[in-house]
Each structure stands twice: as C-alpha cells, then as structure tokens.
C-alpha cells in the first residue's frame, strides 16, 4: 500500500473521521508554536472547559486582559516543567493541574471521576498534526530538523509521534521505520553534543533540543501489517556519546 494512501485514507480517517475511530481533531502545522504547543487547543482547554472557566477569568485579570502575554508565560512554565519530567506520561500524571500566578489550572481531565464520571474526560482535546516540522535553532543557527509523519497532542501539549512505512516501496515498520527513528535520534544527539560540549552541565539544552524524542510518551512506527512502539529512546544516548567520542560510531547501522 502506498504511504500516502495509508496515511490519508486509513490512519487519518480512523483517527479523525470514523464513528468507531478515535475522534481526534486534525490541526494544521502552522498552528503549533516553536515549543510544540497547539496554542488554540491549549487556550480553549484552560479557558473554556468546565473546571477552568472561572479560574481563567480570574487569571486573565492579573494580566490586565492581555491574553497573548498570559499564554506565552503559561507555555514557558509548562515547557520548563516538561523539561524537568522524565517523560510526558509522568508529566501528565503529576500535573493534571498546575498553580499559575496563584490560580489552579487543570491540564487534563481523567476518566472515571466519582463526581463527574466520564463527562470531564470528554472535554479533553486530542489532536493530531500531519507532517509537522521540528526545527531546533541554537544561537540563531539551525542545528537540526526533521518532519514526523503524524504528531499527537493532548490539550495542546505534545505527546509523541509516529513514522509510517509502505510495503508499496518495499519498506516495513520493523526494518525501515525503526531505523528511521533511530537515525533521526542519533543525528539529533550528535548535533546536540557538538553544541553542548562543556556548556550544558545542567542539561538545559538537552532537555529542550531532544525533548521530542526523549520526552515522548512513545514513538511508534507502523505499516499496513505491523506497529512497533519505541519507548525510552534516551537509553541510547550514552552509547551514542561514547562512540562519537572515540570515533567508533557506526552510522551505517542507523540508515533508514
């Protein structure tokens, strides 16, 4: 099956259109901020959903009704917390709500609430973006970029991504998909090592640069037959670093 048919006619249809599918919302790549937030989804969730409406109005007053400034500062706080978390699963589990400027804001509504049942869960905004560019700039220069096939968001917050492979081109998720993910990660890790040598003791740059890989709940690759889940890709980092330092890195091993 051709990759575009797999992506558009099957997966995107299942994610967004079918009544027995996931009922996600598709959003455009140009609505995603440089720090990987779907700004309108985040804004909607913290300002219009049941447990956030009143709190948001109160919060907005502290910003003299400057909504743009509020959102920018709020995303900065979230981005920092994400960087301090092991991954997005732990971030969401530990930050179902946050206190911002003294005001409690919910970030996610769990299902099965004793009081609300699943009603609040239904207010969560699950979104996907096709062909979303990830670009990392350092000191005004582009260091790394790639474009995952599908990227997933929850209430405007990045969750993970998926790479698709097509047997039409004699490719498979097992071989080419996993290799593509490993190749992208090793390229990013090597570029990070080049700019961070001696300058990233606190790993601030790493937390920002490699977050799309290392913070993802999971990275998946799929074809028409199989799906593979890659977790904890950061476990490869020390090996990549060691082999780069002693010039023994086998780049051919990671070719997609």
Describe the residue ranges of each PLM region.
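An alpha-helical interface "stripe"
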Residues: 1-256
């Amino acid at each position: 099956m051709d990759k575009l048919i797999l992506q558009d006619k099957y997966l995107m249809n299942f994610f967004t259109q079918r009544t027995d599918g996931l009922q996600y919302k598709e959003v455009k790549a140009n609505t995603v901020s440089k720090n990987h937030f779907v700004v309108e989804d985040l804004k909607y969730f913290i300002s219009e959903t049941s447990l956030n409406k009143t709190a948001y109005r109160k919060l907005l007053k502290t910003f003299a009704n400057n909504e743009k400034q509020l959102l920018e500062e709020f995303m900065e706080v979230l981005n920092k917390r994400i960087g301090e978390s092991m991954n997005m699963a732990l971030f969401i589990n530990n930050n179902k709500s946050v206190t911002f400027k003294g005001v409690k804001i919910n970030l996610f509504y769990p299902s099965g609430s004793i009081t609300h049942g699943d009603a609040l869960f239904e207010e969560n905004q699950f979104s996907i973006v096709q062909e979303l560019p990830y670009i990392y700039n350092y000191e005004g220069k582009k260091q790394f970029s790639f474009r995952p096939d599908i990227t997933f968001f929850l209430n405007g917050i990045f969750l993970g991504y998926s790479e698709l492979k097509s047997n039409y081109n004699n490719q498979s998720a097992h071989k080419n998909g996993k290799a593509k993910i490993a190749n992208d990660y090793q390229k990013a890790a090597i570029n990070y090592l080049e700019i961070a040598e001696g300058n990233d003791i606190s790993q601030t740059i790493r937390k920002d640069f490699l977050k799309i890989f290392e913070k993802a709940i999971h990275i998946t690759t799929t074809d028409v037959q199989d799906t593979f889940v890659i977790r904890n890709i950061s476990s490869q980092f020390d090996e990549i670093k060691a082999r780069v330092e002693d010039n023994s890195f086998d780049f051919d091993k990671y070719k997609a």
